Amino acid sequence: MNDSILTIPKPRSALDFGILVLIVKTILSMSSMWHSSGMVDNILTAISVVLLVAHILSKQYNIKQLVAYAIVTVLFGVICINIGSAGLLITVITCLAIRDEDIERVVRFIFKYEFWLISIHCLVGAVSTLLGSKYYVLYHGYIRYSLGFGHANVLSAFVFNLVIMYFWLKFESLNSQDFIAVIIVELLFYRVAKTRTSLYLSVFVLLIVMIYKNKECSKLIDALAKYAVPILSLFTFVMTFLYEKGNLLSHAVDQLLTRRIGLASYAYNRLGLTIFGRDMRNFTTTWDEYYGFSGGFTFDNIYSYLLINVGIVILLLIIVVLYKVAKQGSLKNNIFILVWALYSMTEVHGLSCYMCFPILFAALVIPGSYRARERRNAIEPSI
């Protein structure tokens, strides 16, 4: 990595301070060592929202634009109230706040602060583990270390987000040393956390290599980026619908995705779909011989999560927004839309722009974001 990664940018506006507060809030909310209380989390959320809204108002948008912002915020606010989580609203407000900003500067800002804060967290977590703290779980006979985060998958998600931000920021100047360094890092964290993120990263690296060597492949990526999310959404729903009917393909996909289809089917057959979201924080599974599990519940798949928990209306909005971003024709952005779509088959972190950054591309298609669109292909200095 370039030595300039050591340089931490100074916050220079309400936007920067708001984003920094949200980075800290996100890491604390996912930490077992420094987990923030509900009150602290709410205070950090309130501070960040005030800062981001102040930045939006400082842009002196016209009444029509502000009304549109208010409508979008209210819609997502209602959804967040329905599901009992403000995470999605934070992403929306962040996207609205950076509408007229240089998105590469914003991503670089997030990358550098997350890199250092997560590195410090992992170092302290590793030392604490060596000193006897149980930041690990025994899973099918092997140990999965979380380095102080609530789950090994959370550690993996943060590392994966850093990796894809790094690739996006250095896209025009990537070299073999970058690939080797990232693969070594991912292999190391695979040994620590025992997650499949390294598999997705390997596919991603191969994808970039093919794109540089094959123009036809580039055209294919542009096409896939437009339709990946609706295709995978439909595929997930069909597999979920067929699971309880004993469909062999559905069960095979379920095994490949480590029970994610089965969990979605369990929820779907008891709750159905939702348009504007529902609160599932207290939803648990009871023993069922067909499904073979009981206890806590999680989706770990964005598409089933949106269909059954968050609301179909949000899924449709994401489909439209990412289609419009893909239609802009930026090969770099389209690669990462596809990465987001594939990664979403195994995680729900993609709805947080601070845990899976490509959702920030939504800012590029907000009406009036001309400066952002003009800059989207600009080549910035390497990080």
Indicate residue ranges for each PLM-predicted region.
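Hydrophobic transmembrane helix bundles of membrane-integrated enzymes that assemble
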Residues: 2-30, 41-248, 269, 292-375
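Interfacial loop-to-helix junctions that mark the boundaries of transmembrane helices
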Residues: 36-39
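Long extracytoplasmic/lumenal interhelical loops at the membrane interface
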Residues: 249-310
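Membrane-proximal cytoplasmic C-terminal regulatory module of class A 7TM GPCRs
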Residues: 374-383
